[in-house]
Structure formats: structure tokens, C-alpha cells
């Protein structure tokens, strides 16, 4: 074995325990990295790669970052999905003989970030854990370490359900056992793009048993235990801010899978991957960071409980009715800092004096917010006001102890107010009097020597000194001034009197700073006693902030309060797409009605490309979501059912599953909706069948419509270019044709974006191609071909009894020569039998993809 130096041996011993992390190894004022860590980090962080003697013939690769600026480099690594183990010197080098002892004091990973600079103010930073129970169910737990939130549930052991939970939470890190990680498919791991951490221990630490309630299932407790044990092992500090685990049921909220949320652009735009242009972007006028985080949670999980929805609507109504009080409320909320994350930093022990000032200033606002809510004389808002705990004793303590303009550092003094501690006042008086004496000494020495430029200064290396320019040194009396330091143009001296006073001043300052730090830590420890109360307060303030945001947005955008229907019917008069309207401007947007009930379950939408079919469909879904989060909706009138689920297949999703064709994605998403939808669900299907041959696509589209009509009875909006399908209105009682109107003016098509009853008479596809400025000769050729096709066209419609009303005499032409069929090989026969034996309706979309990969590998 290579004989490394003692320091490198120490590094390797520690690194062996943290193989999946970059080890930041403290050497003096730097964090150093060696070997593979150095090679990789130098490229990722764009820092210089050097070498260090380590006992080998060749230098060991090394790179490093300054200790005082390491946080920026750590943030970069974490943002890219890496982990960083912070290894500190845990002994004083001055008092230690030989090698200084070093230990990892914290493992920072994407899910355990606590530094404010590494967190997004209005986004949670979730870490989750998984426990698979006998392959039947997943115990699932998650936490935001920065806020102390801890929740858990039990979900079906399917990758689709797991993906939905992880993506709903925007999870940064998932803790699994080695066996659980192996079970999860590579497709899922790539799709999620999160950091996986392997951890086996799943017993709940003794000090955290109070966080778990008795009624929780075994799998749920194991998931919580795995999460808590991992956090304890990696963070190596008090986690007293973690709240009691709250059990939640996914069935208590409207369900939307990842693809539906992305298609509807609820919190992330498809193109920009940011908030701009999303429903969250539109509805977010929250004034606090914690309010912004709660708003995203509300949008991610719309309510299905009628009572809860109406309660939120009542609060929004009251806030809208009190305009001036709401303005006052907004001003108060602007001065409330992030109480959740402040409480987290207090528990972590990395809070500074400025954080405590922010806490104090936030608590000042609570009585004002409470008074404003009470002044509205609203029963619902009074209940909210009474939940606000001003923590008066804490406010008084912080006011008494901490100065208003405290420094960031907590070890250099200037934090504690005069009069708070008598001993501190004594030290400060000694220091201040000494400094007054210093100022007087400078005046006397100038008079004595006649040197007007003489000054008394101080630095940490040499202490106090008298500085005289070299040109004036001859004026100094002999024997009284002792030279202390020589500069280029001056000399620095000390006198016996100055030396004596210096000791008194510096002793007083040192003792003062030590006592200040002690007093500050006492205040900080006292704040820990209020963490639970602060977390409850933060939740109440966040809720108020979300409700005022709904009121503000509803008023500014002319939203109205929807009525919740009892019979499942949907009637929207002059509805608008809230986001498109905001981007375009209210004057430009064309509003439309939408009506769905028991006799009108499916709307079959036809009309030209670019006419607004997809926008209309999204508009209906977003209106429902707005209503079920408790907000008002963009319409003149609205009566809405409470949807239990929303399923969408609306364009722009072809890239969602790596390696899958458009048609495969269509079929997977269609299957997901058809199998899981109920009569209380909403289905949006845009151009189903477009990814395959015309007759194949049309046949599938018709079969899907019929299946939904006969078996599912979900409210459905189905857009299509297959105009033959409009004849289904004659066969299916619950289907109604509607179309997006367009007119021709002077040979040009004008899209009116208006929904009308009945089918569209033309598709205007060639006009759209003309708008795209395809070559004129190509457009003319397409027009001639269209005329020929239309003259030979016969409609095909297969009725429910499977008897064709009219069947085209010619089959669809192939683009390629048709080869005579050959007898299938034994290998192909086996594959065909395997495919025939598959129960497609019992497969999840993810199961279907994995099976397809398996079949492909057998072919190749």
C-alpha cells in the first residue's frame, strides 16, 4: 500500500465514510479537496487544479476554496445535485501536538440546505423517504428542513403514484434502501432528476418518538424513521424545530398527475421552465415568503371538501369587501419576515443578531394584523385573527436585549444594548473612557511636540501606537518614545503611559466581546422555547397572506365567486383563460361559455389549427382549479362541480418520457385517464390519434370517446381534426359538437376564437400553412390535392352496434410498397403470444413503458 503522509491518511480515512460527497477538508483558511474530488470539483467550480506532496512520487491532485467564501461554491455543487461533507478542525492547532483532529460536522445535500442563499424564498426544499412494505404499499414521508415541516402518507406501490407525489412536492432528494433503489426503474430515476441517497436504518430515534402518532401504519413509521435517522446522522445537530408528523391522504385533494400539471402550466411553464406565464405566477400577490410557499402548496393540491372551499371563498369575499383595510393588511404583511425559516435557523444555532431583529420587527406587526382583521367585523376573519399569537414576552425580550443596527458577526460585539447587563456596561465604560483618554493623549502629544500630523492609531497586530512622519521624527524628545514599527514614510512609537492604558482598554474590550457573545447565546436559547409557537404563527400569517392575494387578484382581474353545483353540472358564462388574458390584455381576449351536465358529458371540439381549441380546454380546467383552491374565477357567471381528478393530453408533451414516440405518450396518457377517471373527473383530450396513420387514429379516437361515454361518464372535452367523428353526436346521447368559428375574408382566414354549437365546416389547414409562409407553389399544389380528395371522399362512421353505415371502397394507401406477408418465425410467435397474454388494463403507464423496453430488447 502507498505510504501517504499522516495528513493524507487522515483525509482518506474520512473520505472513505463519505464516498458519495465532495469532502471539504479544512486546512487553515481553506477547504481543500484531493484525488478524484479535486479533479471533478476543479471542472465543475472552474477553479485551479494544483498538486500537493503526499508521500507518493507524483503530486496528489488538489484544489481548494477560501473558507470565508466557501458557501458560494457549496451552493453551486448542491444546485447541480451533488453532496458536500464539511470537515472541520475540532482541536485548536495552537494547543495540539501532532496531527489536528478533524471530523465531518455536517453533510449538505440538495434536500438539507439551510443557508438562506441556497434556498428560493417562495419554494419549499423537500427531502423525502420511502419504505416499501411487502411490495404492496409505500410508506412515504417528507420534510422541509428549513421550515420544520414533516408529513407522511401511505400510497400504492406503483411508480406512477410515487412520481406524482415526488413531482407534486418538487422533491430535491429521496432516501431509499439499496434494495428499494434497485427496484426503481432507470427511466424513473432519469425522469425525476433528483438526488438519491441510500440509507438502511429506519427506526425512529428515541429523541424524535414524540413526532410520530400512535395511529400511523408500520410502513409510514418506517419511512419517517428512515428520514429522521438520515437527518440526525448527516446534520449532527439539534433538530428540535421539526414539527410533529402530520398524516395526509392524497384522496382528500384533487388528483392531477405530473403530465396534467405540466400541460396546464400550474407552477412551471413548459417552455421557460419558470413561473412566468403559469397559474401560480398569476395568483401570487403574497407579501411574505412563507405565504408564497403555502400558495404553491394550495395550487398543487386543490381541495375537494365543499366546506373547506366555501370557507376560503367566504374569507376572500370579506377581504374584497374591505378595500382600505386590505391595503393596510398588505402593508403590515410586507414587514413580516420568513418566520418559518427564522425558527429553523434558531434551532440550528446559526441565527445571527440581524435575524433576531427581523424576528422582533415581524412580531411588531402581529397585533396590527390582528386589529385590522377584527376591524372588518367578519366572523370568518375574526376566527383567523384569534389564531395570531403575538408572543409578547419574546418581543419584549428582543427589544430589551438587541440593538437596532446589529452587525452580522456575533463574536465582535456591538449586539447587546446598553443597560441590559451591568457587568457589560462596566466593561464598556472602561473601554470608552480609555478611548476618550486616547483621543486626549493625541491632542496633548501634538501640543508637546509641535507635530500637527501626529496621530494615535490601532491595529490588531501591534495594538495602539503613535505615528509620526519620517520628516518630523527629529522633533520627538529623546528617551520617551519607543520605536514599535517602521513604515516607508513614517515611524510608529509607543510610550509607557500608552502601553499601560492599552492593556486596560484591550482587556475590557476582550471581556466585553466574550460577555456579549454569552448574552447573545442566552437570548438565542430563549428564542428556541418559542419555536413551536412561531411555527403556528407562521402558518396563520401564511394563510392570511394567501387569502389576501386571492382577493387582490380577483378584484384586479374581475373574477367572480363561483357557485358549487350539487348535481355535477358545469355552467360557465363568458369564461376566460386567466393567464392568457393577463398576457394579452382583457380587451383582446375573447370569452366563451361552457356547459356540461348529465345529458351533455362530452364536448367534441372541431375547428382550425391556431383557433384556440387547446386554450379553451385549458381554460375550463384552470377555472375549476381556481375554484377548488378557494379563489374566485375568470367569468361573468360560474357554477362548477367539485372535480376529484383532472386528466389532460394537450400537445407539447412529446418530450415528457425519454425515448417515447408521440403516439406512445398519447396512448399511455389516454389509458391513465380512462382507467382512473370517475364520473366526478374532468378529462381533456387534444387531438388523440394524431401520432399514427389516419384511419388508425380515427378508429382509436372514436373508440376512446365511446368508452368514456358508456363506462366512465367523466366530463370530457375532446378536440379533433377527424371531422368524421362529428357524426357521433347522432349515436351518443351525451355527446355534443361545438366548434371554434372562423371566417374567410378576401381569401384569407380570420380566426374569431369564439365557441359555437355544432361541428366546424372546414379545417382551414391550408390557410394556416399559408400564414406560416410556405412557398406559394406548395400551397397551390396542396389546394388542388385537397379538391381531389374531397371529391372522392366518403364518410366512415361505425355505429355502436358495430354495423358500418358506409364504408369506403378503398383501403388507406401505404406510402411504401407492401411486401407479401411471410410466416412468422418462432421468435416472433413467442413475442406475439407474450403480447397477447399481457393485461394492458391492469398496467400503469410506467409498467407499460418498462414492458415495451423489455420486448424491444428481445427483438434486438
From Swiss-Prot:
GO terms for biological process: mismatch repair. Keywords: ATP-binding, DNA damage, DNA repair, DNA-binding, Nucleotide-binding. The gene is mutS. GO terms for molecular function: ATP binding; ATP-dependent DNA damage sensor activity; damaged DNA binding; mismatched DNA binding. Pfam families: MutS_I, MutS_II, MutS_III, MutS_IV, MutS_V. GO terms for cellular component: cytosol. Belongs to the DNA mismatch repair MutS family. Signal peptide: none annotated. It comes from Listeria innocua serovar 6a (strain ATCC BAA-680 / CLIP 11262). This is DNA mismatch repair protein MutS. This protein is involved in the repair of mismatches in DNA. It is possible that it carries out the mismatch recognition step. This protein has a weak ATPase activity. CDD domains: ABC_MutS1 (cd03284). InterPro entries: DNA_mismatch_repair_MutS, DNA_mismatch_repair_MutS-lik_N, DNA_mismatch_repair_MutS/MSH, DNA_mismatch_repair_MutS_C, DNA_mismatch_repair_MutS_clamp, DNA_mismatch_repair_MutS_core, DNA_mismatch_repair_MutS_N, DNA_mismatch_repair_MutS_sf. ATP binds at residues 607-614. The keyword Nucleotide-binding applies.
Amino acid at each position: 500500500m502507498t505510504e501517504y503522509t499522516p495528513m493524507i491518511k487522515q483525509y482518506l480515512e474520512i473520505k472513505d465514510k463519505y464516498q458519495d460527497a465532495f469532502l471539504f477538508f479544512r486546512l487553515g483558511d481553506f477547504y481543500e479537496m484531493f484525488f478524484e474530488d479535486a479533479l471533478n470539483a476543479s471542472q465543475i467550480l472552474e477553479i485551479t487544479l494544483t498538486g500537493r506532496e503526499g508521500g507518493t512520487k507524483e503530486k496528489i491532485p488538489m484544489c481548494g476554496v477560501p473558507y470565508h467564501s466557501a458557501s458560494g461554491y457549496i451552493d453551486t455543487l448542491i444546485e447541480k445535485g451533488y453532496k458536500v461533507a464539511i470537515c472541520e478542525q475540532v482541536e485548536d492547532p495552537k494547543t495540539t501536538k501532532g496531527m489536528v483532529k478533524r471530523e465531518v460536522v455536517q453533510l449538505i445535500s440538495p434536500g438539507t440546505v439551510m443557508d438562506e442563499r441556497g434556498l428560493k424564498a417562495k419554494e419549499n426544499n423537500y427531502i423525502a423517504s420511502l419504505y416499501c412494505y411487502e411490495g404492496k404499499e409505500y410508506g412515504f414521508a417528507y420534510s422541509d428542513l428549513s421550515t420544520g415541516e414533516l408529513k407522511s402518507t401511505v400510497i400504492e406501490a406503483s411508480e406512477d403514484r410515487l412520481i406524482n407525489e415526488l413531482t407534486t412536492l418538487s422533491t430535491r432528494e429521496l432516501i431509499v434502501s439499496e434494495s428499494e433503489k434497485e427496484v426503481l426503474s432507470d427511466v424513473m430515476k432519469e425522469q425525476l432528476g433528483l438526488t438519491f441517497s441510500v440509507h438502511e436504518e429506519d427506526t425512529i430515534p428515541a429523541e424524535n418518538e414524540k413526532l410520530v402518532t400512535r395511529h400511523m401504519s408500520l410502513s409510514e413509521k418506517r419511512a419517517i424513521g428512515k428520514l429522521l435517522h438520515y437527518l440526525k446522522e448527516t446534520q449532527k445537530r439539534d433538530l428540535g424545530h421539526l414539527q410533529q408528523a402530520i398524516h395526509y391522504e392524497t384522496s382528500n385533494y384533487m388528483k392531477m398527475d405530473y403530465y396534467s400539471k405540466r400541460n396546464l402550466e400550474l407552477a412551471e411553464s413548459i417552455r421557460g421552465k419558470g413561473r412566468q406565464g403559469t397559474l401560480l405566477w398569476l395568483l401570487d400577490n403574497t407579501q411574505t415568503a412563507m405565504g408564497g410557499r403555502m400558495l404553491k402548496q394550495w395550487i398543487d393540491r386543490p381541495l375537494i371538501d365543499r366546506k373547506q372551499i366555501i370557507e376560503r371563498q367566504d374569507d376572500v369575499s370579506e377581504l374584497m369587501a374591505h378595500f382600505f383595510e386590505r391595503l393596510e393588511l398588505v402593508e403590515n404583511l410586507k414587514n413580516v419576515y420568513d418566520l418559518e425559516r427564522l425558527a429553523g435557523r434558531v434551532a440550528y444555532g446559526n441565527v445571527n443578531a440581524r435575524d433576531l431583529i427581523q424576528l422582533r420587527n415581524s412580531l411588531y406587526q402581529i397585533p396590527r394584523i390582528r386589529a385590522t382583521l377584527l376591524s372588518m367585523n367578519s366572523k370568518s376573519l375574526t376566527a383567523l385573527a384569534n389564531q395570531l399569537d403575538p408572543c409578547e414576552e419574546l418581543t419584549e425580550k428582543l427589544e430589551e436585549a438587541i440593538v437596532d443596527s446589529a452587525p452580522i458577526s456575533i463574536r465582535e460585539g456591538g449586539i447587546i444594548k446598553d443597560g441590559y447587563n451591568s457587568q457589560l456596561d462596566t466593561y464598556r465604560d472602561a473601554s470608552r473612557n480609555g478611548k476618550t483618554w486616547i483621543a486626549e493623549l493625541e491632542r496633548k502629544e501634538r501640543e508637546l511636540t509641535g507635530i500637527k500630523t501626529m496621530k494615535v492609531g490601532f491595529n490588531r497586530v501591534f495594538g495602539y501606537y503613535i505615528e509620526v512622519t519620517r520628516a518630523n521624527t527629529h522633533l520627538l524628545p529623546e528617551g520617551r518614545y519607543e520605536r514599535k514599527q517602521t513604515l516607508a514614510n513614517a515611524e510608529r512609537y509607543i510610550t509607557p503611559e500608552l502601553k499601560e492604558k492599552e492593556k486596560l482598554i484591550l482587556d475590557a474590550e476582550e471581556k466585553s466581546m466574550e460577555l456579549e457573545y454569552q448574552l447573545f447565546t442566552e437570548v438565542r436559547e430563549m428564542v428556541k422555547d418559542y419555536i413551536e409557537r412561531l411555527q403556528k404563527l407562521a402558518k396563520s400569517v401564511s394563510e392570511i397572506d394567501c387569502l389576501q392575494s386571492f382577493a387582490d387578484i380577483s378584484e384586479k382581474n374581475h373574477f367572480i365567486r363561483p357557485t358549487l353545483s350539487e348535481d355535477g353540472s358545469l355552467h360557465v358564462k363568458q369564461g376566460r383563460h386567466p393567464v392568457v388574458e393577463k398576457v394579452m390584455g382583457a380587451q383582446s381576449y375573447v370569452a366563451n361559455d361552457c356547459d356540461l351536465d348529465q345529458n351533455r358529458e362530452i364536448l367534441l371540439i372541431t375547428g382550425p389549427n391556431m383557433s384556440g381549441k387547446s386554450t379553451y380546454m385549458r381554460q375550463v380546467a384552470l377555472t375549476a382549479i381556481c375554484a377548488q383552491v378557494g379563489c374566485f374565477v375568470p367569468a361573468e357567471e360560474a357554477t362548477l362541480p367539485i372535480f376529484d381528478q383532472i386528466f389532460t393530453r394537450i400537445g407539447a408533451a412529446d418530450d415528457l418520457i425519454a425515448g417515447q414516440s408521440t403516439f406512445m405518450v398519447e396512448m399511455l396518457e389516454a389509458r391513465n385517464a380512462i382507467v382512473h377517471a370517475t364520473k366526478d373527473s374532468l378529462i381533456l383530450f387534444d387531438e388523440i390519434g394524431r401520432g399514427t396513420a389516419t384511419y388508425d387514429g380515427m378508429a382509436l379516437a372514436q373508440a376512446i370517446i365511446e368508452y368514456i361515454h358508456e363506462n366512465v361518464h367523466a366530463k370530457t372535452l375532446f378536440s379533433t381534426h377527424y371531422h368524421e367523428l362529428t357524426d357521433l353526436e347522432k349515436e351518443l346521447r351525451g355527446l355534443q359538437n361545438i366548434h371554434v368559428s372562423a371566417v374567410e375574408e378576401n381569401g384569407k382566414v380570420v380566426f374569431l376564437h369564439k365557441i359555437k354549437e355544432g361541428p366546424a365546416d372546414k379545417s382551414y389547414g391550408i390557410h394556416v400553412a399559408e400564414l406560416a409562409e410556405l412557398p406559394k407553389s406548395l400551397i397551390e399544389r396542396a389546394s388542388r390535392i385537397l379538391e381531389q380528395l374531397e371529391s372522392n371522399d366518403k364518410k366512415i362512421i361505425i355505429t355502436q352496434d358495430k354495423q358500418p353505415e358506409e364504408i369506403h371502397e378503398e383501403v388507406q394507401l401505404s406510402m411504401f410498397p407492401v411486401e407479401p406477408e411471410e410466416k412468422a418465425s418462432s421468435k416472433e410467435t413467442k413475442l406475439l403470444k407474450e403480447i397477447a397474454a399481457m393485461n394492458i388494463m391492469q398496467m400503469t403507464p410506467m409498467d407499460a413503458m418498462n414492458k415495451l423496453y423489455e420486448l424491444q430488447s428481445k427483438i434486438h
